[in-house]
Each structure stands twice: as C-alpha cells, then as structure tokens.
Amino acid sequence: MISTADFKNGLTIEVDNAIWRIVEFQHVKPGKGGAFVRSKLKNLRTGAVQDKTFRAGARMEQAPIEKSTMQYLYADGDSYVFMNTETYEQIEIPGDHIQDELKFLKENMEVQVTLYKGEVLGIDLPNTVTLEVAETEPGIKGDTASGGSKPATLETGAIIQVPFFVKAGDKLIVNTVDSTYVSRA
C-alpha cells in the first residue's frame, strides 16, 4: 500500500480495478477544508487519460509492473510475436494493444514489453530507430539542408516529414516519440 504522499510521475497504482500510471500530480492545501491531491492518470489497459482527485493521505495498492526486453519476431495475422531475450519464451500481442508502435516496428527489433501479472499492457520502442526510405519525391537541384521538408514513406509504412535532400533508399534515424526525422544513418 502506498499513500498520496508517495506519488511521483511514472508510478503505477491500482484504483477501481484498473491499472493507472501517474502522468502528473499536484498537492493542494485550500484555505478551508482538508488537503487533497489532484492527479492526471493514464489507464494502461485502454490508454485513456483521466483526472482524479484523492484526499491527502489516501492509501491504494501499487501495481506490480514488470518490464521485459523482448525481440519482435514476426506478424501472425492480427497478432505480433515477441520473444523474451533471456528465457526465449514467445508471446503473442494483439495488434490493437500496440497500434501506435506498429509504424516503427521492424523484425528483430528489441523493445521493452510492459507486463502486469503476466498480462501484456503495451510495448516501449527505443527512442530512435534506423529505417530505410521506401518512397519519396525526388529532390530538385539546389535543395539544401536548411530548406523545407517533404513527406517520405519508410519501410514500415510510416510517413514522416524529411528534408528535401533525402531520397529513396536512404537510411534515416527517426525519433519514435514524436515521429520526426533526426538525421541520416
């Protein structure tokens, strides 16, 4: 059991039979009445973000979240197969659990899988990945690094904005957090 005094960003708690990650929180002491904690929580099963208020000193269960390093092997219909790099155990994750991450997921990529009592809650990609440009408009003579940008389709199907000098076949380093071009690989 933990108290609201132990709150910190990233902590996972169990409230109302749901697993929540604390996104942000604030201790409030009004001039009249008891103190309370205003928090923004993200449901790890559904991804929904919700504001919740707890009275100061309220106690709740800390959710035992595990993170395992796993390697993405292949897609199997609507599921994706990952292998634990330590035990070589394979698990299938439904595509709807990892919809946002699919655009940067490549075979043999290592990811962090978030588990709660054996249930997969999601995956965390590395902050940057190296991907090849599958298709983009050809550059025009005189394009410079300081110019604008154009859309490019990557090998995984993701579409990002890249500088004019990038051409099909180039390998790029892409930020997976905000889906932006970082540099050439």
Curated annotation (Swiss-Prot):
Alphabetized Pfam families for the sequence: EFP, EFP_N, Elong-fact-P_C
Compartment(s) of residence: Cytoplasm
GO biological process, alphabetically ordered: peptide biosynthetic process
Pathway terms, separated by semicolons: Protein biosynthesis; polypeptide chain elongation
SUPFAM superfamilies: Nucleic acid-binding proteins, Translation proteins SH3-like domain
Cellular-component GO terms for this entry: cytoplasm
InterPro entries found in the cross-reference section: Elong-fact-P_C (IPR015365), NA-bd_OB-fold (IPR012340), Rib_uL2_dom2 (IPR014722), Transl_elong_fac_P/YeiP (IPR020599), Transl_elong_KOW-like (IPR013185), Transl_elong_P/YeiP_cen (IPR001059), Transl_elong_P/YeiP_CS (IPR013852), Transl_elongation_fac_P (IPR011768)
Swiss-Prot/TrEMBL keywords: Cytoplasm, Elongation factor, Protein biosynthesis
Protein biosynthesis in keyword set: yes
GO molecular function, one term: translation elongation factor activity
Superkingdom classification of source: Bacteria
Main localization (coarse): cytoplasm
PANTHER family tied to this protein: ELONGATION FACTOR P, ELONGATION FACTOR P (EF-P) FAMILY PROTEIN
Protein family according to the UniProt entry: Belongs to the elongation factor P family.
Function recorded in the entry: Involved in peptide bond synthesis. Stimulates efficient translation and peptide-bond synthesis on native or reconstituted 70S ribosomes in vitro. Probably functions indirectly by altering the affinity of the ribosome for aminoacyl-tRNA, thus increasing their reactivity as acceptors for peptidyl transferase.
Protein name in the entry: Elongation factor P
Lineage: Bacteria, Bacillati, Bacillota, Bacilli, Lactobacillales
